[in-house]
Amino acid sequence: MNSPAEPRCIVSLTYDDALPCHFESVAPLLEEHGLHGTFYVPCSQGFFDNAESWREVATQGHELGNHSVFHPCHDQAWLDEAYNLRHYTARRWSDEIRLANNILTLVDGRTVRSFGNTCHHNIIGSGATASTVAKLVPEFCVAARGEHTGKPVDLKKINWFNLGTRGADQATFANLRAEIDRMCVRGGWLILTMHGVGPRDHNLHIAENEHTQLVEWLAARQDTIWTAPVRMVAEALKPSRRALAQAAR
């Protein structure tokens, strides 16, 4: 489904951490049903090991979103302390995001993409030196998925650099369908965050059958629900981006 003139009901399917299931089964499933997603890929060893597979994902129309290089987060038990956002400066974070953008451009040839906040965190540093992703990311990306809010984006007051997302790991199709149906009554943009699809690649995951049902349902409703990558939605809805796109036609 192409961008409608005034989209009212939007869904973005986003997948984190460059997992093998994403290019092996998720992207092909979306393509089979005429849909595209955003894959937020950290530009670390796992990504480099499968660079050609990710290039093919991008070639098929999916977004490769910036998800940093080292996946820094705040105070996670599994986190290498060297990559604790508490210890980052604004410059260090900016340098890492710039590097990730450059790497992704080498893979997909694109210079415009969205950012997926690692662990949904928005704070860089701590105390008096703290900054926010929302303040820094406009230099690098057209939009940022932002913090976990558990609700749709209000189309009347969009914060482009802290959009807000709903985690869909462990979610059921029935619950997601009900949420989307409610959103479509009043209008909105639901950005769903998933890690694994099935349990193979990540302890955070949505069951494969629940995910397949969601994809099939969205594909059957492309006349009323616009399912699109975050970058594509931003380019369609942001006035400055829309003007550039129209001028290029």
Give the positions of each predicted feature.
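Catalytic domains of cell-wall/extracellular-matrix polysaccharide-remodeling enzymes
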Residues: 25, 30, 45-49, 73-177
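Amphipathic, non-transmembrane alpha-helical secondary structure
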Residues: 23-32, 51, 55, 59, ...
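Short, surface-exposed alpha-helical recognition segments that flank or form part
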Residues: 14, 88-92, 202, 206
